[in-house]
Amino acid sequence: MSSLDEGLKQMSQQEYRNEEQNQEGNQEDLNNQNDHNLNNNELDSLSSPPSDNYNEEEFEQEDDIKPDIKIYQNASQNNISQTQRISQTQLPQQQGGGGKRNSSLLQKEHYHQKNQEIIQKLMEKKKKEQEEKEKKELKLKKREDKLRKRMLEEAAKIREQKEVNLESQTEQSDHSNVTKSKKLKFKSVQDIYQLVVIQGKYQREQLTDKQQQELNEFESRLNEEKTTIIKMQQVYRSRQITFLEELKKKQEKKKQEEEQQKLKQEKIQTKLREQYENVNSNLYAETELFKQKKQEITKVSTQKQLVRASSAEGDKEKDDKKDIAKKIQQKNQEYIEKLKEKKRQEIAKEEEEKKKKEQLKEKMKDFVLVNIKKDIENGVFFVDVPEKKPKKEKKKNESKEDNIQITSPKLNSTKSLSSQITRKTNDAKKVEKLPKIKDSNKENHSKERNEDNEEGDDGEYECDEGDEGASDGEDEDDGNGSAIKRKLRKYPFITDLELWKKKQRLPADIKVFIVTGGYHDISKALKKRGWIANPDTKSPCYNFRWSLQTKDIDYENLKDFQIVNHFQKSACITTKVGLCKSLRNLVWHENVDIDTFYPRCFDLNDTEDFENFVEEFKSSKAESILKRYMRMYFEKDPDIEKIKKQAVIAFNVCERKMKELDEIIDDPNSIQLITKKEWNILSADELTEEKLAQKKYEQWLERIEGKNKQKPKKKKKKSKKDKQQGDTEKKEEEEGEAEDEEEDEEDEEEEEKQMDEFTLKVHQILKRYKVKYPQDCLTGEDNVWIIKPAGLSRGRGITCYNNLVEILDHVKSKESQWVIQKYIENPLIIKKRKFDIRVWILVTDWNPLTIWHYTDCYVRFSVDDYDTENLQNKFTHLTNNMVSKLKQRDEKDDITELGSMYFKENFINYLKEKEGYDVFTDKIEPQIVRAIIMSLKSVQDNIENRKNSIEMYGYDFMVDDLYNTWLIEINSSPSMEYSTPVTERLVKAVSEDIVKVVIDYGMEKSKKARKNIETGAFKRIYKGKYVEEKTNVVGLNLICEGVALKKGKKNSNVAKVNNLKPNFS
């Protein structure tokens, strides 16, 4: 080895030994100090005073028993000498045993005093020594870590140098022929190393004692180096494994990027092909038009040439044509006169027929009246079939024709009776048998249908509430296989579906539906499947009904085969109050804490809930003050002393809240969590009633005086949330990758050491809050709560407050039912905006509970940037589409182009770019599915189940900055309007998929066929077990009466039971 290698080696070994010696010395000091310290039991035994029969010789023997305790022994000897002097000088000599007793009492008292002083000193020393121990141990741990790192680095270097030197020395040793067996004299360590290299050629007996010692030392060093090398190998292997894993991940990322690029290129190529085909098709069309124009021009030119050639012959032909025209006019005049005479004769005949009909009316009055009354009682009505007339005649005779439907006939008036009689007599044959239409009349029928469509009757009935008239044109066979389209009529008195179909002359197998409330896509999907719409929206004749509200459905008269889109008593989940109360019953069904997915909510009209809210508001106020205190501490804000008083009381409140139930029950002062004095200090920064009244008065003056004009726009201050996110993004750009978790823990430990006692306690209790309360992340520094009216929707009447006085004033001033919920103060923000997620759910049965989840959800954004300073601005805190419609954003981006909404794909891609993995499918979507199942399980016993009933719900979720999803509310009959491009695409798809699930899948009886039926984007996420319905025992009074059986005698037969007379009622 070279001199440089030896120096490095020796330096590393010496440092390692010195550190080990220091550690051993520190440990020996600690052990010595521990030997000097006394246990509490030993101190109690030593501090006990001597008995009444006390002698100095016995005391000296006790001192000899414990020679190890030097400090206490010296002190005890001094005490003995002092007591002896006192006894010799002060006390007189007394006879008998009385003098000995008095001296022993004095010695006891003096001995007690000295012992107590020594014990206090020893206990103080103990505390100091323990603190020094802990400090030294931490220092030793840090030094050990540093030394290990250095040793590993130096061992790696030594190993590399050794390998090089060994290779060079092995080559030299092969050339040298060492065969002498003389005793060697080693001048340096190199000779020893060479001797070790040449193994087996020297014997130990030939070496001196010093050489053997050096060899042994060197071999021990080699063994140590080998151990270090083995450790280094393990370290390098672990690093190599991690390096290989990182390489694999990078390669997979590259492959994914390449695949994405390929997909993009393929999409671009397909777009280019489509464009190319469109261009070719346009060019082809233009060329054909050009050819047609050429041909027309050539025809015109040839015609002009022919006209010029025959101009001479044309003059003669013109004269002949004039003569022929005169003759034709004469004949036409004669024909017109004949027609006029025929019309006069027809008019005279019609007048005669009218007179005859009037005579018949008078004769048939009594007979017809009786028949009409019977028909009205039976619900049978006759319908006019209008004759086919051209468009002009229809317009003239619209006023003369009677209405198609007879709704309320006036039996008392003679005019109405006469009109009904004429209908009976003239059109009875038409009602019974329709005339067969021949093939020659098909064209006329189609023309008339087109004319009717031009006038306004499109042949399609929009199923909205309040619409009246005929329904869709239905096809009817004319006997020859051709279809005729006609309009359905309304029969309000018919309740039987089969009878209704007979009246409409429809086949018995056809299905009928009613759709109201603007769900046009559902009606289109049903028409594709051959269903027919009933024009009367209030009619009970249907197979399937989809309505906006439950009150449109008559549940008492429903039949088993009729399908309806609402369940009874579903308000327990679709209203804000119902959801708040029903989720508390989830404990009876599942062992789940609702605080993990539903922000805490209270009904302010319930006195118990109101009191709980006030207490919760005050405790969350204390928590927000502590969080503000810690932020100011880390930012080194000089105003932290102003909050110190509030922080101390807030800490006491939080510490009280963290106590367990057993401690609270035993504590007599645990009735109030916060006293009035404490709350006055905590709410020092809030409004009082006087300040609130003054604020309202100023607002009223501004409205009157017109001071609320548009002021010049100021630059918005960044909210605390935006500042924190901006700072974190800058730090990530500057620093690159974050530090390891171990380093973060070390930093936290160092910060905790630097904190004073109070801040350390605050820091620890906030940590405990995070562990115990899952909604700790929702409370920030502002303590914001959101108030919602229980009966309204679409963002109406919703306000945010962070002041208890304002909340109470808001609730008292307006008479309605209010619900208050904890506002999420740490929402996930996308491009400076707040958002929520709308998810559609379909429940097809409650026993067993079957839930269908529509996987294609969408995201709704607020209009303005997120800011907690202005809580009254709806455009920053609400994401409802009805609110965002009222304002347009100045800045345009991909969100505003889609109407302040996002598709699911856009949301997933944004989170992938931000986090590097699919956060939605891995973390957010499973939480959404869990919350849906748990919320519906909580209401399973409250909603009235009915087979062939379904219901669609709209779930609203929010996501916080830790990617925790929170259920906000559940809506019945969610909106299906084409408000934005996002909803237009999704509503069309959802309505088609609803029909697939309810009609195609639900009406199929065979299980094998169901497996092959498509359900679109709907996926069944849960199907529970069937629960047998309990028998209704309520209202029965069961009584059992009789006589008890008695034991017979030994020799008697079986006891008779004739006296037992049961009476059940």
Curated annotation (Swiss-Prot):
Entry-linked InterPro entries: TTL/TTLL_fam, TTLL_monoglycylase
Compositionally biased intervals (Acidic residues): 54-63, 451-479, 734-754
Keyword ATP-binding: yes
UniProt keyword annotations, A-Z: ATP-binding, Cell projection, Cilium, Cytoplasm, Cytoskeleton, Ligase, Nucleotide-binding
Gene Ontology molecular function, alphabetical: ATP binding; protein-glycine ligase activity; protein-glycine ligase activity, initiating
EC number: 6.3.2.-
Residue ranges with Polar residues bias: 73-92, 166-179, 404-423
TTL domain segment(s): 633-1009
Name this protein carries in UniProt: Tubulin glycylase 3C
Organism: Tetrahymena thermophila (strain SB210)
Lineage: Eukaryota, Sar, Alveolata, Ciliophora, Intramacronucleata
Gene, per the UniProt record: TTLL3C
